[in-house]
């Protein structure tokens, strides 16, 4: 009789069979079960992302409505947003509710600027009205720079680094209180500069022409002095 052969191969486990700790469902019990799994470390990074995506889809309409209401309020009453709007208008541009869009984003960012379309605000990433104000101001600095300096967004990393330095410095997102309470940065000295530099490097790293972190840091360093000192359209760093 022929010898029987025993297979040593293990059954393949598909991605669908992997337990990430995330449980589907919109009911209150399932929601808190997922929260408990996150708090106790029973949910993987993939599961946490699944939880966030499900939450964002469930809250999309409410998130966008809240974002639009706060956007309109800031356009009317926020000193920095009104000042940036006026400065952009003086250069022949126009940013208002018709081209500042509140949308659900699938990548984890606060917003973006496109010269053709305007400003995108990621409604599902906005923590509060202050966060929205910082994000709008940041993207408005990009819009101002595009109109005044003719930024080459595609091919010139120095241009990208300079406008990121200015946007992070002038928008208010790097002021001490924001860093301390929201991002857990505890330094008291040189905090503003370190925040601006860190965010500029991360932004340049995301550009197609950037090779690595070292390349991004080199580009940021090359333009740092002139771009950090340039506070236009403000006389000095606004906040």
Swiss-Prot record:
Disulfide bonds: none annotated. The keyword 4Fe-4S does not apply. Has a dual role in the assembly of mitochondrial ATPase. Acts as a protease that removes N-terminal residues of mitochondrial ATPase CF(0) subunit 6 at the intermembrane space side. Also involved in the correct assembly of the membrane-embedded ATPase CF(0) particle, probably mediating association of subunit 6 with the subunit 9 ring. It is found in: Mitochondrion inner membrane. It holds the Pfam family Peptidase_M76. One of its GO terms (molecular function) is metal ion binding. Residues 1-22 are annotated as: Disordered. InterPro entries: Peptidase_M76_ATP23. The lineage of its organism: Eukaryota, Fungi, Dikarya, Ascomycota, Pezizomycotina. This is Mitochondrial inner membrane protease atp23. Residues 1-13 have a biased composition (Polar residues). A divalent metal cation binds at residues 138, 142. GO terms for cellular component: mitochondrial inner membrane. One of its GO terms (biological process) is mitochondrial proton-transporting ATP synthase complex assembly. Belongs to the peptidase M76 family. Keywords: Hydrolase, Membrane, Metal-binding, Metalloprotease, Mitochondrion, Mitochondrion inner membrane, Protease. Coiled coil: none annotated. Its main location: mitochondrion. It is a peripheral membrane protein. The active site is at 139. It is an enzyme of class 3 (hydrolase). Its EC number is 3.4.24.-.
């Amino acid at each position: 009789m022929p010898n029987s052969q025993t297979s040593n191969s293990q059954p393949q486990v598909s991605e669908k069979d992997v337990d990430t700790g995330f449980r589907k469902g919109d009911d209150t019990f399932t929601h808190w079960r997922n929260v408990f799994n996150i708090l106790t470390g029973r949910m993987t990074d993939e599961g946490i992302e699944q939880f966030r995506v499900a939450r964002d889809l469930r809250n999309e309409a409410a998130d966008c409505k809240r974002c639009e209401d706060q956007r309109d309020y800031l356009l009317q009453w926020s000193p920095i947003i009104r000042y940036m709007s006026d400065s952009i208008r003086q250069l022949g541009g126009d940013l208002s509710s018709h081209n500042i869009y509140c949308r659900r984003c699938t990548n984890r960012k606060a917003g973006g600027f496109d010269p053709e379309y305007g400003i995108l605000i990621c409604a599902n990433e906005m923590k509060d009205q202050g966060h929205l104000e910082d994000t709008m101001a940041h993207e408005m600095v990009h819009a101002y720079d595009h109109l005044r300096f003719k930024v080459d967004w595609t091919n010139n990393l120095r241009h990208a680094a300079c406008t990121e330095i200015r946007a992070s410095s002038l928008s208010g997102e790097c002021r001490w209180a924001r860093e301390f309470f929201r991002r857990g940065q505890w330094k008291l000295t040189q905090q503003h500069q370190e925040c601006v530099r860190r965010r500029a490097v991360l932004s340049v790293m995301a550009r197609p022409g950037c090779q690595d972190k070292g390349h991004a840091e080199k580009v940021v360093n090359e333009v740092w002095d002139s771009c950090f000192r340039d506070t236009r359209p403000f006389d000095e760093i606004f906040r």
